[in-house]
Amino acid sequence: MTDKDMIEIWTDGACSGNPGPGGWGALIRWNGHEKELYGGDPATTNNRMEMTAVIEALNALNRPSKITLNVDSTYVKDGLTKWIKGWKRNGWKTADKKPVKNQELWMAMEEACKRHEITWVWVKGHAGDEGNERADGLARKGTDEVRGRK
């Protein structure tokens, strides 16, 4: 696999109130091309939108790929790279025996990741990373649309 086969993705979630109306956005770059994705939910949380952005971006790819996935959510990155094995081993319970929040999204995200080779990168949000800023703008667009603003 060459560098031109590499796909780079930035994802972000947004929520107006938490919970409240929210949106998700993703920027996908490959071989000189770009694709923007976004959507929203009228009643959600920021974490759910962060997770949805990753799921939607990965599910938009039509073949197994080598991906650099840039996220500004340590919740998403750590959840999939550190915590999920323990949650599954413990019957989807946290270390303090409480049910894992957003279990259905964790399961969907894990499934979406299976066919890809992913390098997870945490980027600081609102700090000038061009891809992250674009994903943030898309997430805000998704939020605005579910709130009835265009």
Swiss-Prot record:
Its cofactor is Mg(2+). Pfam families: RNase_H. Binds 1 Mg(2+) ion per subunit. May bind a second metal ion at a regulatory site, or after substrate binding. It catalyses: Endonucleolytic cleavage to 5'-phosphomonoester. It is found in: Cytoplasm. The keyword Metal-binding applies. Keywords: Cytoplasm, Endonuclease, Hydrolase, Magnesium, Metal-binding, Nuclease. Mg(2+) 1 binds at residues 12, 50, 72. Residues 3-144 form the RNase H type-1 domain. The keyword Ligase does not apply. One of its GO terms (cellular component) is cytoplasm. One of its GO terms (biological process) is DNA replication, removal of RNA primer. Residues 129-150 are annotated as: Disordered. Mg(2+) 2 binds at residues 12, 136. Its main location: cytoplasm. Its EC number is 3.1.26.4. Endonuclease that specifically degrades the RNA of RNA-DNA hybrids. HAMAP family: RNase_H. PANTHER family: RIBONUCLEASE H1. Belongs to the RNase H family. Monomer. This is Ribonuclease H. It comes from Hyphomonas neptunium (strain ATCC 15444).
